[in-house]
Amino acid sequence: MLKAEEVKLFIAGRDVYSFDPETKEFAAMIHYGLDGNCLVRFAAGGTDSGVYGFEGDSYWTRYETFRNGERHRFDLQPLGLGIAQAYFADGTIAFLQAHSMDLTALSKG
């Protein structure tokens, strides 16, 4: 798993593209502002705003309505350059995360 500083570099101030981990279908793009605010733009349309932060080697998010407005913590497993698999704190697989829409680095991991 990525360590605290690596998680911050992967998330803070970036646009992160989220994909279904099985189908690799684009699901959403999340902008993580340097001020702790985030905005998700869903592939199916619509947006939701929220906040995010860091806790140990993890990061957390809480949106107004997405995921029932609840706070969720995630760990990141690196899979390739600019690509990581997110896991909920309980170990359940979450979105595949990437710094671009291009997932070709997965085949080089």
Question: Language-model segments: which ranges?
Answer:
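Cysteine-nucleophile amide-bond enzymes
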Residues: F54-G56
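Lipid interaction determinants
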Residues: M1-V51, W60-G109
